Curated annotation (Swiss-Prot):
Reported function: Part of a complex that provides reducing equivalents for heterodisulfide reductase.
SUPFAM superfamilies given in the database record: HydA/Nqo6-like (SSF56770)
Highest rank taxon of the organism: Archaea
Family (UniProt): Belongs to the [NiFe]/[NiFeSe] hydrogenase small subunit family.
Underlying gene: mvhG
EC number: 1.12.99.-
GO terms, molecular function: iron-sulfur cluster binding; oxidoreductase activity
Protein's name according to its UniProt entry: F420-non-reducing hydrogenase subunit G
High-level lineage: Archaea, Methanobacteriati, Methanobacteriota, Methanomada group, Methanobacteria
Record carries keyword Oxidoreductase: yes
UniProt cross-references to InterPro entries, sorted A to Z: Hydrogenase_assoc-protein, NADH_UbQ_OxRdtase-like_20kDa, NiFe_Hase_small_N_sf
Keyword terms of this UniProt record: Oxidoreductase
Length: 308
């Protein structure tokens, strides 16, 4: 019998949800275990961080949030022959990346001094026992070389299991490259996706059956999101939030979404609605269009003016 492949997993700046998707491989985990042994996984096994063995493959969840994350990422890159960036936090920075809208010191002050849920009358900032924050959250691939990326918050277990099995058996790994709209069952109106207004989900109530959510006033990130999920959320009338990130052809998910909406206003047809008025209805543009991918955007953080 051929020697089994040695697999490890690690979480960095993530929530462990991606590890739960690995646990949700269900019976497919049996197929994986026929080809591989899990040698290291602080989340799924009772292993210590200082016992990282030599690995054939390591699956890393989470982006680079603090100096400890960076150190582990660099060591895992040295110990593993093949690195998989697993989940949207690892691939794009994820929701923790919205921290990039503030300076590091502002974040620390808000967490330990200003927060009403953290009694700290003496104003003590933990320093010795708490890893130091990086200047900004970064995707894993910005710190170490990554061999393969599996986005998702968390990745679909069936898709992830197929990708891991393909890797273990030497088959070619293929993930979808189309955007979500191309597989969504909802119909796009012939006049385009122009929005006369923007509404929150509770304001719309139950959306019209089978009609695209965008012309109904709901921000759906489908035009700027890769179709790995199979359009599960829009299929049940829940707008896509973009948790799988953009397609391989798109460099900036938020910019792509803004472009997709703006280019469909059909101003040349004397549309009466001013696009700027619609945009003003968005309370949080960055939080809406870059929920999961700000650290990987063309501008990955708030630009600080000199002297501020």
């Amino acid at each position: 019998m051929a020697e089994k492949i040695k697999i490890g997993t690690m979480w960095l700046g993530g929530c462990s949800g991606c590890h739960l998707s690995i646990a949700d491989f269900h019976e497919k985990i049996i197929d994986v275990m026929e080809h591989a042994d899990f040698e290291f996984s602080p989340v799924l096994m009772d292993t210590k961080y200082d016992e990282i063995p030599e690995l054939d493959v390591v699956i890393i969840e989470g982006g680079i949030v603090n100096d400890e994350n960076r150190e582990f990422a660099e060591e895992l890159r040295e110990k593993a022959k093949f690195v998989i960036s697993y989940g949207t936090c690892a691939v794009y920075g994820g929701i923790p990346g919205l921290r990039n809208l503030w300076d590091k010191d502002e974040v620390i002050e808000e967490a330990y001094i200003n927060s009403i849920t953290t009694p700290n009358e003496e104003g003590v900032i933990p320093s010795e026992d708490v890893p130091h924050l990086e200047g900004r959250v970064k995707p894993l691939g910005e710190v170490i070389d990554v061999d393969f990326e599996v986005p998702g918050c968390p990745p679909r277990s069936d898709v992830a299991a197929e990708a891991v099995m393909a890797l273990l058996t030497g088959e070619e790994i293929e993930l979808p490259e189309t955007n979500l709209c191309e597989v969504c069952p909802r119909e796009k109106p012939p006049e385009g996706l122009a929005m006369d207004f923007i509404k929150r989900q509770f304001e719309v109530g139950k959306p019209e059956d089978d009609l695209c959510l965008i012309p109904q006033g709901l921000i759906c990130m489908g035009p700027a999101t890769v179709s790995i999920c199979g359009a599960e959320c829009p299929s049940i009338a829940i707008p896509c939030r973009g948790c799988y990130g953009p397609t391989a052809r798109v460099e900036d998910q938020g910019a792509k979404m803004i472009s997709a909406i703006a280019s469909d206003y059909k101003v040349e047809e004397d549309k009466t609605v001013d696009p700027e008025e619609v945009a003003e209805q968005l309370d949080d543009i960055v939080g809406t269009f870059y929920t999961f991918t700000l650290p990987a955007a063309l501008i990955p953080m708030k630009i600080q003016k000199e002297g501020k």
